[in-house]
Amino acid sequence: QIGSKTVSSLRKTDIKRFYNYLADERHLKPATIDNIHTVLHQILDMAVDDDYIRNNPSNNVLKELKQSHCFQTEKRRALTKPEQELFLDYLKNSPTSKYWYPVFAVMIGTGLRVGEVTGLRWCDIDLEEGIIDVNHTLVYYDHRTEGSKRGCYFNVNTTKTPAGRRKVPMLGFVKEAFLMEKERQELLDLHCEATVDGYTDFIFINRFGQPQHQATLNKAIRRIIRDCNDEQLLKDENAEVLL
């Protein structure tokens, strides 16, 4: 498979063969292959940025796989406005979960991808003008296949496309979320201790001063939704749960 190849020797046919193997022999679900593609595509984008390859060989491969296998795309339902308000209100007032309010408020209020939010630095936001400068993504993946002994660690993926580099306006509650996070870190004397590819001073950090990553946020949101649903059900047996 592709693990034995160098990045410069990878071709689109190699990626196609790998995805077909995952679907036909490993019988992985489309959503799982989609997740693998997300990571692989970002890694190869970084290889393009570093001039190891000229083009990303994974471009459009997932789309072609879905068409050839007649995969049904799983429709993801966005939270309704009442659900968003319920979710954020619960976070803001929960003694055990309010720590997560700022990062999820920013996600909901901006529509940014997880890696774009976790990659935000204080210099990327203008609180006075209410503008967020989105210019890179924070990526966390396993480097051991590249010969590194360090295993999983972060990289910054800069994008050259207009869609990837953009200015996003802050809603009022998004600005409030940034200020809450700033105040919390000042109160706890927390500082970013990480430097990733020359980038530092990340906004959303854990208690060790390291950037948050997707796996941690996924676990947190599942726990929050479970607790939020339980609390609503206790208040009203006929209440509809969040998800």
Language-model segments: residues:
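Basic, Lys/Arg- and aromatic-enriched nucleic-acid-binding interface segment
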Residues: 30, 34-38, 49, 53-55, ...
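N-terminal core-binding DNA-recognition domain of tyrosine site-specific recombinases/integrases
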Residues: 1-50, 95-98, 211-217, 236-243
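Generic recognition of well-ordered alpha-helical segments
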Residues: 17, 38, 42, 89, ...
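Conserved tyrosine-mediated DNA breakage-rejoining catalytic core shared by Y-recombinases
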Residues: 60-66, 83, 119-194, 198-199
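Arg/Lys-rich amphipathic alpha helix in sigma70-family domain 2
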Residues: 45-54, 180-183
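Short, basic (Lys/Arg/His-rich) helix/loop patches that form interaction surfaces
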Residues: 89-100, 110, 168, 184-194, ...
